[in-house]
Amino acid sequence: MLLIDTSLWVDFTRSSSPEPLKRQIAPWLLDPAAHLAEPVVFELLRFARPHEAQQLEAQFATLPMLATPSSVWIEAAELGRACRAKGLTVISLDLLIAAVALHHRATLVTFDRDFASIAQTSALSVRLLERGG
């Protein structure tokens, strides 16, 4: 199971992203194992213009959603404390996304190196991609 992070979606949907980068990302979004998480949807829709939000929602409808049960919020807080104990400062939504991935035993696919740091303090499985294109 794969959880596609916000960073891939942003680069894939941004009109200014180079086509080679979009071609690099597309197989991940089309992978049958690809899933969304509610915090990722929130991050993407938060700043989207109305027409962009409609397009995103249409794309999101094609992927299964990993739920964020109430226990995951506590797990995210615990993860944040573990990171802080190792001197890592991680934003709250990244902790929540990581906790969702851990809860569902999904591999998080991302360009965001902060998740590699989170993986140092947990069992988080991360596929850290490098931007090509």
Annotate the PLM regions.
Residues 1, 98, 102-133:
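Acidic, PIN/NYN-like endoribonuclease modules and their adjacent C-terminal/linker elements
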Residues 5-6, 44, 76, 101:
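Generic structural signal for small/hydrophobic residues in well-ordered secondary structure
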Residues 4, 36-37, 68, 110:
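A conserved hydrophobic position in a structured secondary element of the catalytic/binding core
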Residues 1-36, 45-58, 133:
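Short, well-structured N-terminal submotif of metal-dependent ribonuclease cores
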Residues 22, 41, 53-56, 73-76, ...:
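A general structural signal for well-ordered alpha-helical segments in protein cores
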Residues 35, 66, 127:
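General small-molecule cofactor/ligand-binding pocket signal
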Residues 8, 40, 72, 97, ...:
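Alpha-helix capping/helix-boundary segments
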Residues 64-111:
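Active-site neighborhoods of divalent-metal-dependent phosphate/nucleic-acid chemistry enzymes
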